[in-house]
């Protein structure tokens, strides 16, 4: 649920902010790659937290997920397709939408009990 909502939020934000490189028609802010990577990483971390997984593996998954997001962000920065603020905006979008989705799902589950 968090990934499609993140995609929708990212597309909406791009149309509202409308930041472009000069001469390039692509919209830049927020970075969709980083938004989706952040959302996927956070969903993974949250899933491992509630799954019957050995507790000692949870920090490993969290570090790997964080490394994945940093790798995607660094690649976008090195390729000069995004500025740092685009990447931070993407991370914030993925984080906010995923946490919001998780809170909404938790509230719905608790209400149904």
Task: Kindly give the residue locations of the regions a language model identified.
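Membrane-embedded catalytic cores of phosphoryl/pyrophosphoryl-handling enzymes
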Residues: 14, 21-30, 34-113
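Transmembrane alpha-helices that form the ion-translocation and gating core
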Residues: 6-18
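Interfacial segments of alpha-helical transmembrane regions
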Residues: 1-5
């Amino acid at each position: 649920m968090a990934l499609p909502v993140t995609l929708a939020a990212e597309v909406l934000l791009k149309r509202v902010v409308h930041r472009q490189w000069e001469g390039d028609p692509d919209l830049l802010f927020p970075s969709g790659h980083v938004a989706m990577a952040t959302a996927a990483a956070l969903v993974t971390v949250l899933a491992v937290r509630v799954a019957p997984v050995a507790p000692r593996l949870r920090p490993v998954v969290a570090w790997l997920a964080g490394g994945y997001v940093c790798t995607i962000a660094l690649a976008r920065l090195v390729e000069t397709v995004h500025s740092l603020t685009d990447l931070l905006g993407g991370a914030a979008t993925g984080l906010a939408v995923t946490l919001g989705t998780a809170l909404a799902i938790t509230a719905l589950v608790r209400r149904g009990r």
